[in-house]
């Protein structure tokens, strides 16, 4: 009798495990996840991008940056979009204070809610808009499997601790990327998104005027480039508003020129310069520069798809928010 009871318990355990495994496999991200529940979802997003990105081409960079910042905090769950009246949400953290595109994503969400209420997650909207925005700038496309669910927790401190700041050295970059399951090649390739977009002198002034107690100017910065910035752009330590192109002369084209600038010590951020301080990442950069744009596009797309899978919530985990900015919607 005891043996039979033990056998029955063992069978129950095995069946429970198998059911759990089955549910887990069913809950994974998949291509065309909304094919039945909201068949036009991806077209609605793509059309909105195409209809608006040409009037505001500078929006492509913020949308891909938003995807990056979302995935690095609690996974790709749309929590970066949540508003907080107490100022404690992810978007209140220093790395996100200059983040743009919140209203753009909210408008797409409103369009989808009219057609398919409570169906398409904010997390999926971020992932799809990032891809479609890059394509609109002439960059690569990549597969975006969908089925992400939205998180309801958005924490300022977690964002501060997990999003790599522009002042990061190589050790910090490696650690923060590793925490998300991303390797050194991913680090270099995802940094390639700096080929589009702009920043401000606030992100550069310390490198130009107040780098350390012993050195005023960052020695890793090309001296001619620094002199040009001081003369024509960031004319004082207090200039926080002047716009700087991430990839001067090519900031609206998705290409390899960012890596060429990094090799010339003309990357805007300390984190850009940090990529050349490690032999492994330096080799990846040189291989990219000496290769074709097609090869770069393919590799970048692979890393973007990999990042888009970081710690996603699927199946019964998470929720589908009706308003991306409201945690309890």
UniProtKB/Swiss-Prot annotation:
SUPFAM superfamilies: Heme-dependent peroxidases. GO terms for molecular function: heme binding; lactoperoxidase activity; metal ion binding. It catalyses: 2 a phenolic donor + H2O2 = 2 a phenolic radical donor + 2 H2O. Disulfide bonds join 38-116, 71-76, 122-324, 201-234. Glycans are attached at residues 83, 155, 169, 210, 240, 290. Its EC number is 1.11.1.7. Residues 156-165 have a biased composition (Polar residues). The record marks 65 as: Transition state stabilizer. Mainly expressed in roots. Ca(2+) 2 binds at residues 195, 247, 250, 255. GO terms for cellular component: cytoplasm; extracellular region; nucleus; plant-type cell wall; plasmodesma. CDD domains: secretory_peroxidase. Transmembrane segments: none annotated. The active site is at residue 69. InterPro entries: Haem_peroxidase (IPR002016), Haem_peroxidase_sf (IPR010255), Peroxidase_pln (IPR000823), Peroxidases_AS (IPR019794), Peroxidases_heam-ligand_BS (IPR019793), Secretory_peroxidase (IPR033905). Its cofactor is heme b; Ca(2+). It is found in: Secreted. Heme b binds at residue 194. Keywords: Calcium, Disulfide bond, Glycoprotein, Heme, Hydrogen peroxide, Iron, Metal-binding, Oxidoreductase, Peroxidase, Secreted, Signal. Removal of H(2)O(2), oxidation of toxic reductants, biosynthesis and degradation of lignin, suberization, auxin catabolism, response to environmental stresses such as wounding, pathogen attack and oxidative stress. These functions might be dependent on each isozyme/isoform in each plant tissue. There are 73 peroxidase genes in A.thaliana. This is Peroxidase 30. It comes from Arabidopsis thaliana.
